[in-house]
Amino acid sequence: MKCYATLVCVAAALPLFAAVETKTEKDVVYAPPERCRLDVKWPKGTTNFPTVVWFHGGGLVRGGKHFVRIDESIAQVAVNYRLLGTDGLTDGAECVRDAAAAVAWTLENIAKYGGDPKKVYVSGMSAGGYLTMMVGMAPQYLKERGHDIGELAGLAPVSGQATKHFNVRKFAGDTDPQFLPKIDALAPLAYCSKDIPPIISICGEEPWEWKCRSEENRLLISSCVALGHDKAWFVSCPFADHGRAFTAGVPYVEMFVQGRIPAALKVK
């Protein structure tokens, strides 16, 4: 009988950083809209390193690009994307298209910085976690950019909405209650499959976490496993609310990228 694995966040998971010298390039244009800019940070003096593409949170209506505190031997691409309600944008699919464009840019350009394009991971917090899942699970967005979700090394959404994002619904004119789950073409849950990249979904713990957030991510992971996926994990960070899921969860992004998810917890 298949089941999904749940990891417990503990102090031992906190990262230990070696001294690594890095370089940074800011405000790189990855698509024509003015907000479509990204920052790149990469380790000097080494090659073939992995890269995390990081999408910020903010409900798809606010926030800005930033790096996260992980081992600096891992490159980071921090992304700005267009926001709903800004410059008349009301279609949530356009936010996903921006995210896909940034991932495509990374696949096409990270080798110029010394990175391995076969080691590109996608991650993000909250709205950024939603974008992570949409880009990495819904194949049409990367296909529009000439790429395939199979090119990604892994997905690590942190407290992302697995149903249709509440602000995507709001700006589309949906007036139903926020916590009434909707699953359609703009919901990651619609794309559960054994064929998506390796995925680790990281959330806070109910009842502290955002309502329904942990439960719907558990459903996403368990559905992928039931469909035959053998590299899918769910992480529950004890006592963490939505904000603390970020600080408690980022170390697991690092563990995932470095292949340090304990073998005993791999999905069977």
Descriptions of predicted regions:
Residues 146-168, 179-222:
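The feature captures the conserved acid-bearing segment of alpha/beta-hydrolase catalytic domains
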Residues 202, 218-221, 225-268:
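C-terminal catalytic histidine-bearing segment of alpha/beta-hydrolase fold enzymes
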Residues 19-46:
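N-terminal cap/lid segment of alpha/beta-hydrolase-fold proteins
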Residues 64-80:
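Short amphipathic alpha-helix adjacent to the substrate-entry channel of hydrolases
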Residues 48-58:
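Short beta-strand element of the alpha/beta-hydrolase
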